[in-house]
Curated annotation (Swiss-Prot):
Remaining remarks: In TtuA from T.thermophilus, the sulfur inserted into the nucleoside comes from the C-terminal thiocarboxylate of TtuB, but there is no TtuB ortholog in T.maritima. The thiolation reaction likely consists of two steps: a first activation step by ATP to form an adenylated intermediate of the target base of tRNA, and a second nucleophilic substitution step of the sulfur (S) atom supplied by the hydrosulfide attached to the Fe-S cluster.
Family annotation (InterPro entries): Rossmann-like_a/b/a_fold, TilS/TtcA_N, tRNA_thiolation_TtcA_Ctu1, TtuA-like_LIM_N, UPF0021_CS
Leader sequence residues: none
SUBUNIT field: Homodimer.
Gene3D superfamilies given in the database record: HUPs (3.40.50.620)
One GO cellular component term: cytosolic tRNA wobble base thiouridylase complex
Gene Ontology terms: biological process: tRNA wobble position uridine thiolation
EC number, as in UniProt: 2.8.1.-
Entry protein name: tRNA-5-methyluridine(54) 2-sulfurtransferase
Amino acid sequence: MKCTKCGKPASVKLRHYNIKLCKEHFNEFIEQRVEKAIKKFKMFGRNSKILIAVSGGKDSVSLWHMLKKLGYEVDALFIRAGKSGMVQKAQEIVEKNAELLNTKLHIVDATEYFGGLSTQEISIMLRRPVCSICGVVRRYLMNKFAYENGYDVVVTGHNLNDEASVLLGNILHWQEGYLERQWPLLPKTHEKLVPKAKPLVLNYEEDIKLYATLNEIPHLEMACPFSVGATSLVYKKILRELEEEQPGITLNFYLGFLKRKKEPKFEVEGLRECKECGYPTTAEVCSFCRLRKQVEKRKNKTPA
């Protein structure tokens, strides 16, 4: 098997692009697709103050390495939402990558906002899915940190499979509001909302995994145990099966949506500032502050 670009022995075969590549040209190919996404969707510039949210997983840490390699100045943020051994391992991996990249790493402990409780403990207390609580907490703290520290954009490791599965779910349920706003870049719609960008949207998840492996990038091998049973995994499975039969269909599906889409509508009706914390919300009190109140109320009811 020879590299399509140079004729040297190939390291990988990418069925969805019908090409075979050596390690050097594979890296170049993946990195160029990241650069293409950044420029095509006007995510940020060379002088932007960029904050990447890292979890320790293959996507965020690989993107971290790519952005540094492409010449962008990037600081990283790790939100510690639990106390488990996996969370500790994730933090160690993130710290190792920060050392390798000589990059500033910020760590925010989410449990400090909930009297020391992890998202898992809050989930049990309130009888709500962990993913729901974790999402609320991470989105809020990510934006809060970025805004208060003057960052121009927050970057996340969402890949093509992530975005295509969300798109499929939104179409199947006719979530018109979400379909209107789904885009690789969410611009600023309020002074206290920092833009969010997804530079990996043109890259398949399996290619990011290959990139991390070939380049020996430290990352968590296992997925979050609480994601088991998530609806998004059902949509990903459907797309994987389609991809087996028709290589490239996931990319065509997502790009077709972006190409045919009219100007995205990012404005959110009724956006105002939370009366508790002052951050944007569509309700009187934002979901993060409501969550804090619910936890505080439940803790006060629990006998010592």
